[in-house]
Amino acid sequence: MKKIFLLMSVVILAAACKSAPVATGPEDNSGFKTTEANNQNAKGLNLPDGASVRETPRGKVLVLHDPKSKADVGKPGSTYEVKFGFDNTIEIGTYKDAYNLVYQIINNNSGIRIISEGHSSKEGPAPYNYKLSQRRSDKSYNYIIKLGVENSRLLKNAFGEALPEYPTLKENRRSEFIIIMTEDDLKKYNDFAKTVDINKETN
């Protein structure tokens, strides 16, 4: 009987660990309140020139356009991005510009929070890729904190290989930044995260 109970406990634990955890931050995040009166939708955001928002099922993803790029908006090379090398947490490309813009957006919008969100390509086992994406999320989170952002303004989460939103492996090794303007935004994000199976191998 004891063996059966232990086996059932393991099965329940495994099932509980399949979905991505909700966005987390420091303990004092509970004291931060979004200003819904001033931020009813993305149009209420104070964004720098070139920055925009991409609406997704999980929320508002920041798109940081590179004003120096000759590529058409939405095409590879047209944006500041936080990308990573294969199987590591070393940023490549225009990551410093991306981090600086995120910092600027947080400072210019007192009623928002940002989620630092880590991702990976599908190379390797999904559970390993999830851990890798957690480290990438941490790396981006810590960089922005060091720029001077209060930690109550920043959250973090990771999805491993579960959200391959870009056509190439290289593009999916990334951090993205989600804007949280209201408590409803955060609930929407966390509800979405609970539906994602982070242990499922991506085809």
Give residue spans per PLM region.
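Positively charged n-region of N-terminal signal peptides that target proteins for export
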Residues: M1-I4
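Sec-dependent N-terminal signal peptides
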Residues: L6-S9
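C-terminal motif of bacterial Sec signal peptides marking the signal peptidase cleavage site
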Residues: A15-A16
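Periplasmic peptidoglycan-binding/tethering modules of Gram-negative envelope proteins
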Residues: A20-I112, M181-N203
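Residues at or immediately flanking beta-strands
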Residues: G111-I115, R153-L155
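Periplasmic OmpA-like peptidoglycan-binding domain that tethers envelope proteins to the cell wall
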Residues: S120-A193
